Amino acid sequence: MSKSTAEIRQAFLDFFHSKGHQVVSSSSLVPNNDPTLLFTNAGMNQFKDVFLGLDKRNYSRATTSQRCVRAGGKHNDLENVGYTARHHTFFEMLGNFSFGDYFKHDAIQFAWELLTGENWFALPKERLWVTVYETDDEAYEIWEKEVGIPRERIIRIGDNKGAPYASDNFWQMGDTGPCGPCTEIFYDHGDHIWGGPPGSPEEDGDRYIEIWNIVFMQFNRQADGAMEPLPKPSVDTGMGLERIAAVLQHVNSNYDIDLFRTLIEAVAKVTGATDLGNKSLRVIADHIRSCAFLVADGVLPSNENRGYVLRRIIRRAVRHGNMLGAKETFFYKLVGPLIEVMGSAGEELKRQQAQVEQVLKTEEEQFARTLERGLALLDEELAKLQGDTLDGETAFRLYDTYGFPVDLTADVCRERNIKVDEAGFEAAMEEQRRRAREASGFGADYNAMIRVDSASEFKGYDHLELNGKVTALFVDGKAVEVINAGQEAVVVLDQTPFYAESGGQVGDKGELKGAGFTFAVDDTQKYGQAIGHLGKLSAGALKVGDAVQADVDEARRARIRLNHSATHLMHAALRQVLGTHVAQKGSLVSDKVLRFDFSHNEAMKPSEIREVEDLVNAQIRRNLPIETNIMDLDAAKAKGAMALFGEKYDERVRVLSMGDFSTELCGGTHASRTGDIGLFRIISESGTAAGIRRIEAVTGEGAMATVHAQSDRLNDIAHLLKGDSQNLGDKVRAVLERTRQLEKELQQLKDQAAAQESANLSSKAVDLNGVKLLVSELAGIEPKMLRTMVDDLKNQLGSTVIVLATVVEGKVSLIAGVSKDVTDRVKAGELIGMVAQQVGGKGGGRPDMAQAGGTDAAALPAALASVQGWVSAKLQ
């Protein structure tokens, strides 16, 4: 009996654990502090800083099963998903990594043992082919002489992409940085399937399938293209879980493995589909994986960047559900079946199930309102299409009006053998794409990053001043030996009391002092294992090796500590008041305010805000001890400690507990007891995105300042109302009631004035072929009164055409009215459009009533003068 996908995943991790590898959890699909990536798309992403020498781990061998998404490039990336055997938006990448430990020999031997060993995957050796980079004789000889693969099944691949080192078998992180040759392992499905071995003209067939890529990072590519050997070569490997599952389960398509079969059956159930071979079932089964895990990792549907990619995938899935005949929202119902089929890899998704389902349901409901109308419009356009290409403007209109991502339009067209004018679409939405490009900012020169070989020991939990030694200096990202007065720099010390920005807590400020110099620290940041003090040398000179006294701004740190501890209390209180679906989605802890973003689908009620505030203040009054313990990550999670969104954790973590009320993983600085916080006040609650709320709050002196400010405002209002704060409510209600009465009386007077003005105006109408024409600019009339006046005048004049205008604060307001018996010749919408165009505006409406605005008041007299000629022509 073949292994299940879950068993294959576990077997891979178990194998490498037995070879001394640390099993590391999958990182978030949103790369941590990496602007060069839209989504995590490979197992090595979370180790990038380790490979670059910017970070160090307490292990030199690692293995992972990494969740990945590849759907964020050009908009047609999605079109093959569901239609081919191996295209996915979401997949799991199995990988093993060596950070300066083993190299080619062990990497190849490990792979061969796992794939062919009787106790592991037990694949037939004669079915395996390998490729190596053309000049990588070392790897070639290991495969031939040590592993024993015949020469005819070892293929050298050269620079097949038109440039030096541009090869399927040479891997590069970017234009600069770590790179090296790779060897790939292929599985031969047999001669009953068309295709040829890699490097042959038939290599695109499905017979020979790549199952494992083993990268040997042995060079550092310079900006001029030179390849410098790395001092410690490393290994990065990747094997698609779905691909190896297809091989081990003896199927040719990834969609036929157990995981997808189960999901496809679930899709059929919720959509009512009966043909399990329908491609739309495969599309939806793939898309629920990427969408659910993206939402769980904090991505929300939007029109920019990651959120737009998510929106595209959701809407493509919904449209395929529509094709299957789904009559109601269905997509969110697949989260439960997905959690079941993912097993241990779906634990985080299970914790956030309610939130994920709500986000997907809301997005589907919003799109469902326009899907039918958009499809009808597309059908109309395709029915009258001359040729085989839909114009880009129509594709853009579908996107702009109906929310159709262009790949969804392309999907529909593809089914009818019609192409989409992509160039025209790109031109039509240039502004939107420009914003997305600016925000994504991909591509980086990795050699330009600050690289610190040394490590800094943080001692700020117990000290606010400390003597240390300068181990490195950087100016404009470049290492220097000395800095002089007036220069801005990054100073690295061997040990420091300064806290580097992390976990939402801002970096410390303060001073570094020594013999004849003073360095003002404006911020503190992490650079791998080093802590950098950013600031400016105000006096003297500072050089590498100098002794310094590091002094943290104590008062500022104290305020930060209170705010950070209050953030933990508020997080726990929110989960008690709103529910356990509340999860942190971001935070900022500064000396002035704390800001906390969390998952929740609606605005908090005033009573809920008060309840959270009261609950936090109750814990402050309890004066609970705030304690920290260092323990293994798994033990901390078993204890119930909550992990913070987007944070990376070592295997040994710091667990912060506040009595029995709150337990979280946290490396920040905190008060000693909850009573130190003094007072907690929420100053705002707002939404930042669909399903995400934000609270801002203050503590201690800041909270007291808000109390005093509120009291002062109340006293000022009481003074204005000639009362006191005790009877302020009654006074305000009386003023509001009097105001309502006066507004009512004022409106009555305005109505009377308008009626009188209408009566006066009716005498100014001129007769055009039996139709009364009235055109007038009115002074001192509010724009909203114009409609009432037109209605009155139509009743008085009978067959009539009316144009009225008024100017308020330089802005022109226009209205046109046409009696119903005249609308066959004069339409109010056309008339008002003609006038509005002359005053720099636009407008529209019904044939009998239309309104418009404009910005050019000086042009109004001429515009009104043109009405009589225009109407006369229409009445001929």
Curated annotation (Swiss-Prot):
Sample GO molecular function, one term: ATP binding
Cellular localisation: Cytoplasm
Family annotation (CDD domains): AlaRS_core
Matches recorded under SUPFAM superfamilies: Class II aaRS and biotin synthetases, Putative anticodon-binding domain of alanyl-tRNA synthetase (AlaRS), ThrRS/AlaRS common domain, Translation proteins
Record bears the keyword ATP-binding: yes
One of the protein's GO biological processes: negative regulation of DNA-templated transcription
Reactions this protein catalyses: tRNA(Ala) + L-alanine + ATP = L-alanyl-tRNA(Ala) + AMP + diphosphate
Alphabetized Pfam families for the sequence: DHHA1, tRNA-synt_2c, tRNA_SAD
A single Gene Ontology CC term: cytosol
Cofactor(s) named in the record: Zn(2+)
Stored PROSITE patterns: AA_TRNA_LIGASE_II_ALA
UniProt keyword terms in alphabetical order: Aminoacyl-tRNA synthetase, ATP-binding, Cytoplasm, Ligase, Metal-binding, Nucleotide-binding, Protein biosynthesis, RNA-binding, tRNA-binding, Zinc
Protein biosynthesis as UniProt keyword: yes
Main location (coarse class): cytoplasm
Record InterPro entries: aa-tRNA-synth_II/BPL/LPL, Ala-tRNA-lgiase_IIc, Ala-tRNA-ligase_IIc_anticod-bd, Ala-tRNA-synth_IIc_core, Ala-tRNA-synth_IIc_N, Ala-tRNA_ligase, Ala_tRNA_ligase_euk/bac, DHHA1_dom
Superkingdom of the source species: Bacteria
EC number(s) stated in the UniProt entry for this protein: 6.1.1.7
Cofactor, how bound (note): Binds 1 zinc ion per subunit.
Function: Catalyzes the attachment of alanine to tRNA(Ala) in a two-step reaction: alanine is first activated by ATP to form Ala-AMP and then transferred to the acceptor end of tRNA(Ala). Also edits incorrectly charged Ser-tRNA(Ala) and Gly-tRNA(Ala) via its editing domain.
Oligomer and partners: Homotetramer.
PANTHER family noted in UniProt: ALANINE--TRNA LIGASE, CYTOPLASMIC, ALANYL-TRNA SYNTHETASE
Domain notes: Consists of three domains; the N-terminal catalytic domain, the editing domain and the C-terminal C-Ala domain. The editing domain removes incorrectly charged amino acids, while the C-Ala domain, along with tRNA(Ala), serves as a bridge to cooperatively bring together the editing and aminoacylation centers thus stimulating deacylation of misacylated tRNAs.
Protein name as it appears in the record: Alanine--tRNA ligase
Organism: Salmonella choleraesuis (strain SC-B67)
